[in-house]
Amino acid sequence: MEFMKSLSGHDALLRIRLGPVRAYVVCEPGLVQQMLREPAVFDKGGMLFDKARQIVANGLATSAWTEHQRQRPLVQPAFTRARLEAYAPVMAQETDALIDTWQSERPVDIVEQMVTLFARITARTLFGSDLDRASIATLQQALPVVVEGVYRQMTAPLRMWEKLPTAANRKYHRAAADLHAVIDQFIDELEGVQGDRPDGEDMLSALLEAREGQDRLSGAEVHEQIFTFLMAGIETTANAMSWTLHLLARHPEVQERLHSEITDALAGQVPTLKDLSRLEYTRGVLTEAMRLYPPVWLLTRATTADTSLGQWRIPAGSAVAFSPYMLHHDARLFPDPERFDPDRWCPPRGDKASQRGLFPFGGGARKCIGDVFSLTEALVALVAISTRWRLTPGPGPDPRPVAKLTLAPDRVIAVAHPRPSPRDGHGSGRR
């Protein structure tokens, strides 16, 4: 990550070597926006995405532009505002259930807890309330292994690497089989009762509805989209929240201001989407954490035709990349870029111009389809945690960013201190 940060402030376009591939790195947000506005020319492809498709198939995150154009309108109904309104209470319930287990003045493994939380939220919003705890436990155990295995195979110099009978490969293949089995089992169960079941508010119901009509998702495509949501939806939000809670523990003045805004606005009530839109400082805290530690730290494209970015000509078949992490640490875009400053995003300082270099979920027509869902679940969780607990740094060193598929902290340990309940004035944590 220090290498990416060192590129901040350089010329608009650089040529570097990424492993065996020579790539253009875009360092200027205006050129990044141009690239994202031309998804047919700057398509998902090249060595990494070609490998990814062989591993995780052809979901929205990896599909070529022509296929993405067909799939996205069919998947979009799973992420409507009405469905988000229905998901919010589930997000709050799962967060409360998790933080009920925290103990006063005891260390909390934040990374492990956030993975657990967002695995449960994703499982319930994806599959509905019928998903049993054993299946959720399988998802929690299998997903980190699969994510690690996918990254290892995508970056392996030789295709045969994944065929070697190593312990890591055997563990990956077992975890992937478990994950696919859970997905298939629940699709089969839901299809079997769909005619006798009221319209579901879960994502899988929306995807199964997308199998109706002339242009529809096939059964294999429904499976691929669910696999993609699980791969992308849990780790990214868990990492974003882990970094956010780490920063809050290290900045008590920010944490107290956040708590005051939440208490004044909600008084302990579960927030609606409208409530969340009014929590300006709370949203600023999360946005600033994702500026410093964007869940997606590197995005790559492959040119499908001869083209240009600004004054630079780029031949067809070229690898083109940009790093949200690099742009987010560019002092030309964000003065004093290493400072954790949520007020960057709040009135009177926050405006559209300040967001032109912000890319935590990519951008353009291929921006993450679940960005609003991810922000909503993170905000709901942040509200619930900040209402009931105050965090201070735990023992050990500060976390170190680890760049894999996402930008993960190697560890975050915080000590939890109960806060008085806004409703009754009593401590809300277990003692």
Predicted features and spans:
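Cytochrome P450 catalytic-domain helical core, especially the substrate-recognition surface
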Residues: 1-5, 17-22, 29-34, 39, ...
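Cytochrome P450 catalytic-core helices
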Residues: 236-261, 371-389
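Conserved, non-catalytic sequence blocks in retroelement Pol enzymes and Pol-derived host proteins
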Residues: 84, 193-196, 273-280, 368-370, ...
